[in-house]
Curated annotation (Swiss-Prot):
Protein name listed in UniProt: NADH-ubiquinone oxidoreductase chain 5
Keyword Iron belongs to the record: no
Enzyme Commission designation: 7.1.1.2
Subcellular location, record wording: Mitochondrion inner membrane
Species in which this protein is naturally found: Podospora anserina (strain S / ATCC MYA-4624 / DSM 980 / FGSC 10383)
The protein's role, per its UniProt record: Core subunit of the mitochondrial membrane respiratory chain NADH dehydrogenase (Complex I) that is believed to belong to the minimal assembly required for catalysis. Complex I functions in the transfer of electrons from NADH to the respiratory chain. The immediate electron acceptor for the enzyme is believed to be ubiquinone.
Gene Ontology terms: biological process: ATP synthesis coupled electron transport; electron transport coupled proton transport
Entry keyword set: Electron transport, Membrane, Mitochondrion, Mitochondrion inner membrane, NAD, Respiratory chain, Translocase, Transmembrane, Transmembrane helix, Transport, Ubiquinone
PANTHER family tied to this protein: NADH-UBIQUINONE OXIDOREDUCTASE CHAIN 5
InterPro entries assigned: NADH_DH_su5_C, NADHpl_OxRdtase_5_subgr, ND/Mrp_TM, NU5C-like, Proton_antipo_N
Pfam families: NADH5_C (PF06455), Proton_antipo_M (PF00361), Proton_antipo_N (PF00662)
């Protein structure tokens, strides 16, 4: 059963990719979708067997690298963390496969698309089930390649190609540091196997743990789009909407958070790494929320909300609340996939226009889509008793429950980020569905926007159910005080970092309710201003101050401008100079060009000795004879100098 979870998506990828013409579009869709659905059912059974019974399963297939001091076995382990990650990955993957049947129906490259989707699912399974860092790195690179292939799926569009290259290069920065971290683990511990590394972690130098932790954190920053290496995520929205839902909301972007959770037995032994995680997550949350408020592309707004929620997960990791981070990761996957698929339904209905300022009044045409996007937005803003409420508010409470300066400061910053998250969620819903119609007449009269078929709507309904009930049902499993779900030590919390009881019982009720109170009040204020004081808003936006503020945040804090002007150009200039001086200069001079020129000059000088005069040859013979006689009287040590002198004379 456990091997089937890994192999079935790969079989679907191979059949759809290599035999696509034989099986046809319908055959490729049927094979890939059925394989992923079967894999999802098996993963739910694995979740029950491994998670509830605390019976980790390890499968060793074959020895991959076998040397005197370094051994790697191609093996997989299924513990509580692994099966918990498989649930959102495979459920959302299967729903996205089904959704894509309708969404991509008019595309001529269906087989290639479904092959890429199945390959991505396979690589993600490799990443979360690997039992060592090297095999995990195979899955890590695999999902990066699949992201590149899927973002540039419509390869005739220049923007799609630019975005895919941007995503690939930004992730290479993180991959470079992750590789350095793996080398540091190998150098200090002699192995990359999880069980060996984690059992030896308490006994190594704290500074080594700091270096390893920072390298792993930078790797996670790139993959999970934390501030600094976040530039690729909004650009990756150029791919098809099902790709955005699968990769850039639910699965691949959570790989960095998964890496930090998996490495919890390592990073728990250095509080500096945890403090870096705490502040990095807080800055990312408020940074992305501010940018998201000033975007007009519906998919980019949702992308920035993804970045904000990933910041929340990193905050939870910085608080050593790994189970809360995992719980929020799973909850977020469901409602964020629902938001993306709902946005895809809207885009599909309005002839592929993504600027939500041109929508308006779509509630009458897309009632189901409005309902599911309302559910997903309520879950995103942590409305009471929705799925997101149980995890997001618990992270904020955990920050306050640490009762330290950093904890309270991060609580305030993350609450501000949550307020902005609410504002742009209300903005998207209001301008898309509730405001006056702003679109062209084609949306409403000639070619009215309509709900999609069963393949488009069924995944939305299933994800809406998860977005309402999943958090309530699984709260006690993941973050309950008496839960033994992680009894297999897949997540490790150092006893001095345990704050669960303080979070549950010591945080004042006011600070538990504060995010919700601010969320509701600011939403009401924003709607009131938009509805009744719209002229004031327009005057402010047209003023010099409003123009500058809007431009600064709309241009994403000008970070891309800074990168292009000062970092990218610097690297390109450095590369150009290195090419000019080293590659085309000294290497050519001492290498092929210089060697060839020297040999030609040497041969010309040698050939000039041939003068065709007998007296000259007699002189050469006489000189050689004298040198032979001198050789017997001179020390052997002078011979090299003599030969060198003759060589110089002949080349002049």
């Amino acid at each position: 059963m456990y091997l089937s979870i890994i192999i079935l998506p790969l079989l679907g990828c191979i059949v759809s990719g290599f035999l696509g013409r034989k099986v046809g579009v319908k055959g490729a869709q049927l094979i890939t979708c059925s394989n992923v659905v079967i894999t999802t059912i098996l993963s739910i059974l694995a979740f029950i067997e491994v998670g509830f019974n605390n019976i980790p399963v390890t499968i060793n297939l074959f020895r991959w690298i076998d040397s005197e001091w370094f051994n790697i076995i191609w093996g997989f382990q299924f513990d509580s963390l692994t099966v918990s990650m498989l649930i959102p990955v495979l459920i959302i993957s299967s729903l996205v496969h089904i959704y894509s049947i309708s969404y991509m129906s008019s595309d001529p490259h269906n087989q290639r698309f479904f092959s890429y989707l199945s390959l991505f699912t396979f690589m993600m399974i490799i990443l979360v089930t690997a039992n060592n860092y090297l095999l995990m790195f195979v899955g890590w690179e695999g999902v990066g390649v699949c992201s590149y292939l899927l973002v540039s799926f419509w390869f005739t569009r220049i923007a799609a190609n630019q975005s895919s290259i941007s995503a690939f290069l930004a992730n290479r920065v993180g991959d470079c540091f992750l590789t350095i971290g793996m080398f540091a683990i190998l150098w200090s511990l002699g192995n990359l196997d999880y069980s060996t590394v984690f059992s030896l972690a308490p006994y190594i130098n704290s500074k080594v743990v700091l270096i390893i932790g920072i390298c792993l954190l930078i790797g996670a920053m790139a993959k999970s789009s934390q501030v600094g290496l976040h530039v690729w995520l909004p650009m990756a929205m150029e791919g098809p909407t099902p790709v955005s839902a699968l990769i850039h909301a639910a699965t691949m972007v959570t790989a960095g958070v998964y890496l930090l959770m998996r490495s919890s037995p390592l990073i728990e032994y250095n509080s500096t790494v945890l403090l870096l995680c705490l502040w990095l997550g807080a800055i990312t949350t408020v940074f992305s929320s501010l940018i998201g408020l000033f975007q007009q592309d519906i998919k980019k707004v949702i992308a920035y909300s993804t970045m904000s929620q990933l910041g929340m997960m990193v905050i939870a990791i910085g608080l050593s609340s790994y189970n809360v981070a995992l719980f929020h990761l799973i909850n977020h996957a469901f409602y964020k996939a629902l938001l993306f698929l709902g946005a895809g339904s809207v885009i599909h209905a309005v002839a592929d226009n993504q600027d939500f300022r041109k929508y308006g009044g779509l509630i009458n045409f897309l009632p189901l889509t409005y309902s599911v996007m309302l559910i997903a937005s309520l879950s995103l803003v942590a409305f009471p008793f929705m799925t997101g409420f149980y995890s997001k508010d618990f992270i904020l409470e955990s920050a306050y429950g640490q009762f330290s300066f950093s904890g309270v400061a991060v609580y305030i910053i993350a609450t501000i980020g949550a307020i902005f998250t609410t504002l742009y969620s209300v903005k998207v819903l209001y301008l898309t569905f509730l405001s006056n119609p702003n679109g062209t007449r084609a949306y409403y009269n000639y070619k009215p926007a309509l709900e999609g078929d069963l393949f488009l709507t069924l995944p939305l309904i299933i994800l809406a159910i998860f977005s309402i009930f999943f958090g309530f049902i699984t709260k006690d499993i993941f973050i309950g005080l008496g839960s033994n779900f992680f009894g297999d030590n897949s997540l490790f919390i150092h006893p001095t970092h345990e704050i669960m009881i303080d979070t549950e019982f010591a945080v004042p009720v006011l600070f538990k309710l504060l995010p919700f109170i601010f969320t509701i009040s600011f939403s009401i204020i924003a709607l009131t201003i938009s509805e009744f004081l719209s002229e004031l808003v327009i005057y402010f936006k047209l003023s010099r101050l409003g123009y500058n503020i809007f431009g600064f945040f709309n241009q994403r804090f000008l970070i891309e401008l800074f990168y292009n002007k000062y970092i990218t150009n610097l690297i390109l200039d450095l590369g150009g100079q290195m090419t000019k001086i080293l590659d085309k200069g000294s290497i050519e001079l001492f290498g092929p060009f210089g060697l060839e020129k020297g040999l030609v000059n040497f041969s010309k000088n040698i050939s000039s000795l041939s003068t065709s005069h007998v007296t000259t040859y007699a002189l050469y013979i006489l000189v050689a004879f004298i040198l032979y006689l001198l050789y017997n009287y001179l020390s052997f040590n002078f011979l090299p100098f003599l030969i060198a002198g003759l060589t110089i004379l002949t080349t002049i």
